[in-house]
Amino acid sequence: MTDSSRVSIATSTIVCVEAEIKGEVIIKEGCVVHPHVVFDATNGPIYVGENNIFEEFAVIRNNSEGQPMIIGDSNIFQVHSKCSAKYVGSRNVIGVHAHLEDGCSVSDDCSIGPKCRVFSKQNLEPSVAVYGPSNSHRITSTPNLTPTLQLEFLRKILPSYHHLYNKKKVTAAQ
């Protein structure tokens, strides 16, 4: 982990020391960051909401010069997913090897399938599923659930097997 003076992690958030955090990154309450996740905020800040899960080898990179990347609450970024979106809403599932390209925007309750892409500058409406080799879109009829049980399990088990990053409390002003 580098540049910890610009990293703020809430006290109830679990971050494994094998994660790499560069630049100004604020991670709010209840998130879980697995080993080998990369947060790269060298071009602009990354603000992460509550109760998100970032699985192994996920890469969250803000490529917009000086503009913040905002990630809402209760999202799951699965193994090897990549996100350079300017905005990700809440309750989204970003599948294994999925890619949110530079400057795209994902609203709430979206599901991005394995190996699917949301292309640069594309804006997804709420409850859109992206699936298949041609990145087809459709509207889903049910919203995504918050990953409450998965978060509880990970908060309990990860500290038993990994060293955790020391945190600084996020204040109300942030």
Curated annotation (Swiss-Prot):
It is found in: Cytoplasm, Cytoskeleton. It comes from the Eukaryota. GO terms for molecular function: dynein complex binding. Keywords: Cytoplasm, Cytoskeleton. GO terms for biological process: mitotic spindle organization. Belongs to the dynactin subunits 5/6 family. Dynactin subunit 6 subfamily. Part of the dynactin complex that activates the molecular motor dynein for ultra-processive transport along microtubules. This is Dynactin subunit 6. It comes from Caenorhabditis briggsae. The gene is dnc-6.
